Amino acid sequence: MIIQDHQKGRTMQDYHKQLTEKEVKQFVNERFLEVKSSEKIKELVTFQAMNKYLIMAHNQEELRVLGRIVASNKKRKLSEIMIDYENNLKLALQSKPTIKTHSNVLMHCFGFFSKEFSDLEKEKFFDLLTDYKNEKITIGKILAEIHPIVYRFNKTYLAGQTYFLLYSNPEQGNIFKILEIDKTKK
């Protein structure tokens, strides 16, 4: 998926490492406006699912509120739901992600494939997480390491997360390259 920067005519891949929180918020808000203009609850449900981890990194409590707003679709008018959702999305995005909130998201992602990991893969994951918590690597680096795992284990729910799209550094290596190198050394 390539994100177009309409003002500059470039793709986000051209300056992926330079994404600011402002640009992340702008991207999410623009996608929400598309959902709102569609006037379809299905689009809002999809938006909520695709942005779950990104919103979680910003504000976990607002993520819960947004989930309840989406779930109220059988009891309320869509126009009311969209207004409430938009207001709470703005509240959620006002909170800046921290190492702690990103670490929480990473642990949620880990839960998707932890049972399928070998002991060595688990160890490598936790080494990366520790490096991130100790500010030795960036969130972009650790996500670039994890992202290929999503495809290896066919975790389509994670593959569609904007969290990976907006925060990872796609040109980085990954944990499987490290493991392959380790295997060839033995």
Regions found by a protein language model. Name each.
Residues 2-186:
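Acidic, Ser/Pro/Thr-rich low-complexity regulatory regions
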